[in-house]
């Protein structure tokens, strides 16, 4: 007898958003109206490479009717968490369970470990000394850097065998200098992901003060700041080799440029012509005044986004679609003016349905769709409205407060939104962010009047 398509693929749902401490019994209670195949044995949790819960699980049910009942539990709460429920199948479940977790083929036999908490400026020689007596393969060490070319405090090391890597893991919480070093299992795939630049910040980083035209490093072609050049040429010139390309290190303990087959054309694709997001993004601004959204509910529609920004009236909404044809939870929203884009930032961290949404300003006053660059700022307004003399003044900030910045005030060409006076004056957190945005927006409009 031929099995139906559903029978061959099984009766499976995927659950996302589970509390980290969630047990199989709690999942059973959540789906108490559904018949789970083989009880708790039909609940298959997904784990990270380090063996920690990922907050996701597959649940095998007894029939298609039970699947329909389970899907009705979508967006119900477990504790204080909203839980999402999706239809899945046994093929997806088997593949995911095989390729995730600490014992997956991607992690089990390649001898990689990841170090975290390295002292600032830690060299490869110090890491080799830390693992004295354990054989590291040639071209088997890398120290990732951020979008400004600074050390992230992490390192990836590949040992000659998985057995040696297991010995290396026993040095967890030992010291280099005064710092305790954390060591985790890793894989070549994880190392490869660290060669992708931070997507949103790097894709549209404002040029640094030394990147103005004629400074020897133009930004008209791909718009990268000095940090990109440091990353490309190698922030660790000494030791066992620096970067000779974005694909890796040239010799010694750095990864060879052919190890992962990466190149600058791939890593920096989609970084010019006002294209936002990944190199494959098709969105192109016509006004140059945009806000990027992240964390959207996966079922959010364009109308939901228009309503989110009400009473502002966006000109256009572009919901990002990934290469697999699914929404990414991100979108670009285009406004008619810089002032509207700034005012829209007051909605940063506001909720859409059950999700809070992060906003990133991508607009500069006085520019239009043909301008050469837009600021892409994460969690920090970095607009230069009214700036004069060609100075950018404001610095790229991550999501970590003001980074010991004691004052953001100064000359008009260097103040936030150019000439509002005052400044942040030692503020070390993001409290009051919405209020500052709203005040700046209204002040700017009154100044124009």
UniProtKB/Swiss-Prot annotation:
Keyword Acetylation: yes
Molecular function as annotated in GO: RNA binding
Statement: the UniProt record of this protein carries the keyword Phosphoprotein: yes
Location in chain, cross-link Glycyl lysine isopeptide (Lys-Gly) (interchain with G-Cter in SUMO2): 35, 87, 98
Chain positions found as Phosphotyrosine: 246
PROSITE patterns per the UniProt record, alphabetical: RRM
Source species, domain of life: Eukaryota
PANTHER family (alphabetical): HETEROGENEOUS NUCLEAR RIBONUCLEOPROTEIN-RELATED
Disease linkage: Intellectual developmental disorder, X-linked, syndromic, Bain type: A form of intellectual disability, a disorder characterized by significantly below average general intellectual functioning associated with impairments in adaptive behavior and manifested during the developmental period. MRXSB patients manifest developmental delay, intellectual disability, autism, hypotonia, seizures, and dysmorphic facial features. Only females are affected.
Record note on quaternary structure: Component of a ribonucleoprotein complex containing mRNAs and RNA-binding proteins including DDX5, HNRNPH2 and SRSF1 as well as splicing regulator ARVCF. Interacts with TXNL4/DIM1.
Name assigned to this protein: Heterogeneous nuclear ribonucleoprotein H2
Gene: HNRNPH2
């Amino acid at each position: 007898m031929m099995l139906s398509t559903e029978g061959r693929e099984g009766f499976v749902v995927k659950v996302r958003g589970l509390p980290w401490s969630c047990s199989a019994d709690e999942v059973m209670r959540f789906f108490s109206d559904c018949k789970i195949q083989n009880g708790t044995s039909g609940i298959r949790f997904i784990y990270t490479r380090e063996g920690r819960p990922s907050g996701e699980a597959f649940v095998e049910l007894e029939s298609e009717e039970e699947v329909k009942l389970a899907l009705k539990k979508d967006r119900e709460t477990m504790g204080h968490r909203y839980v999402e429920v999706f239809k899945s199948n046994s093929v997806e479940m088997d593949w995911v369970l095989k390729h995730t977790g600490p014992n997956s083929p991607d992690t089990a036999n390649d001898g990689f470990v990841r170090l975290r908490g390295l002292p600032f400026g830690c060299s490869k020689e110090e890491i080799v000394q830390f693992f004295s007596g354990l054989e590291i393969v040639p071209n088997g060490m890398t120290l990732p850097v951020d979008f400004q070319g600074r050390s992230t405090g992490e390192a990836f090391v590949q040992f000659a065998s998985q057995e040696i890597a297991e010995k290396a893991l026993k040095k967890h919480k030992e010291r280099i200098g005064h710092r305790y070093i954390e060591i985790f299992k890793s894989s070549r795939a994880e190392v490869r992901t660290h060669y992708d630049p931070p997507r949103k910040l790097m894709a549209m980083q404002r040029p640094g003060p030394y990147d103005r035209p004629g400074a020897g490093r133009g930004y008209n072609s791909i718009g990268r700041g000095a940090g990109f050049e440091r990353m490309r040429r190698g922030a660790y010139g000494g030791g066992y080799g620096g970067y000779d390309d974005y694909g890796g290190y040239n010799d010694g303990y750095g990864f060879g440029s052919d190890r992962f087959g990466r190149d600058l054309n791939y890593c920096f694709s989609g970084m010019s012509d006002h294209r936002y997001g990944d190199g494959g993004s098709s969105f192109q601004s016509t006004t140059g005044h945009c806000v990027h959204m992240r964390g959207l509910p996966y079922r959010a529609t364009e109308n939901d986004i228009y309503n989110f920004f009400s009473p502002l009236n966006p000109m256009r909404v572009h919901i990002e679609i990934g290469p697999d044809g699914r929404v990414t939870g991100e979108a670009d929203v285009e406004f008619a003016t810089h002032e509207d884009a700034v005012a829209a930032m007051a909605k940063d961290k506001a909720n859409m349905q059950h999700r809070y949404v992060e906003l990133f300003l991508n607009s500069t006053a006085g520019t239009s769709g043909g301008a050469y660059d837009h600021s892409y700022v994460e969690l920090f307004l970095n607009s230069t409205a009214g700036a004069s003399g060609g100075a950018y003044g404001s610095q790229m900030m991550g999501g970590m407060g003001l980074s010991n910045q004691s004052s953001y005030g100064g000359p008009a060409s260097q103040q936030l939104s150019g000439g509002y006076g005052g400044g942040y004056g030692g503020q070390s957190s993001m409290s009051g962010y919405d209020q500052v945005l709203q005040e700046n927006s209204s002040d700017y409009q009154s100044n124009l009047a």
